[in-house]
Amino acid sequence: ILLDGLYSQSLLPFGGTVNIQRDRIATLSAGVELNWTLLDFGRRQAKDDEFRNALLASNFMFNRSLQDVVHRVQINYFQLESAQGIVDASQQDLLLSESVLASTEERYVVGLATMPELLVARQSRELAGFELEAARTSQHEDRSDLLIAMGLVPGVPIAFELDADAPLPDALSIGVERLIELAMAARPDLAASMAEVKQAKAAVHAAEAQLNPKVDVVAGVAYNWIDYSLSPVTDLPDHGQGHDSTWSVGLLGSWVLFDGEERTNRIRAARAEQMAAMERMQLARLNAAGEVWDAYFQWEAANKQFAWAESLLASSTANLEATMASYEVGLRTMPEVLAARRALADARQAFITSRAQVLTTSSDLIHATGDLRIDG
């Protein structure tokens, strides 16, 4: 849209050197001009491809960010579940310590236990109480971490359903090589790296297209008004008005022949960025393969450790029961009872932490592959 106005006045001599005539002229012009690129030899297409792939890369990274959030929430949930299990185990350990202390006190009263045995039993009970409070503190910290991972204030009163008896994930029926192939195809951040490579390639084409000419279609239409007056009057007419319309259409070609190698340097920079994008993509693929590899074998190790922890818990429970029975008939000493109780407490903690490790490594493996549909 064009809008142009002009007002001018001039002083002109007439009929001698002392006679001055004032000439006033006012003009106004309004119109529309259209410019349409007819040929640009790939400029617009290259720019379209560049921005389209940039948008795709952003969308893929957004999807990966969502997966990161889900992964953090899962990990913190499993940690909270483990902390709750340790609190429950510590409470059982405290109850057992109190039971041992009560039994020792009864035996001390009738002369079947010594004062050192009684003091050791009390010491064991106090240690169990201390460990229970430490477990509760850790539980509060894990709850706070989970709420923060969910985007909530730590003090929000939310009751989480923690099921320590929930079944563990099934064993995988595919190997680590197949999981790596799945990650190469499913991870959004790798798709974003590929989109960035395509974006850099389109940027090279856009830079190369600047070497070519450009042809535009130009069209315009305008309406013009004019008003003038003369003072003093020396010849008629001394004033007047007029208007008319104008239009134009044509082709406009442009071609930069020399720019001090500015365009050439832009092409070199675009090609260098393309090579860098390809290297970043290759590095991302290697890192993804490494993450899947590590997560897979950590998951395998966690499952084996959990199996040993189950056996350890069963053996420690049986050992404590046998030791207590022998202690009641005088075949075991108090230090042996406390050692068996300590071994059971350690076995419970190993069972709880190894179970949480199985869940955590399962979540790590799913996150490393980028596919939430892994079902074995």
Predicted stretch roles:
Residues 235-244, 257-260, 266-267, 289-292, ...:
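Short, contiguous acidic/charged loop-to-helix segments that flank catalytic cores in large enzymes
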Residues 314-338, 366-376:
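A glycine-biased, small/acidic residue-tolerant capping/turn segment at secondary-structure junctions
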Residues 113, 117, 152-230, 236-238, ...:
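Amphipathic alpha-helical coiled-coil scaffold segments and their short linker/junction regions
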Residues 1, 32-50, 59-67, 71, ...:
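A glycine-/polar-enriched beta->alpha junction
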Residues 65-182, 295-298, 302, 322-325, ...:
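Periplasmic alpha-helical coiled-coil/stalk elements that build and connect Gram-negative outer-membrane
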Residues 9, 154, 350-376:
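Acidic, low-complexity, intrinsically disordered peripheral segments
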Residues 48-50, 55, 62, 80, ...:
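Heptad-repeat amphipathic alpha-helical coiled-coil interaction surface used
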Residues 1-36, 161-173, 205, 218-255, ...:
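Small/polar, glycine/serine/threonine/aspartate-rich low-complexity segments that form flexible
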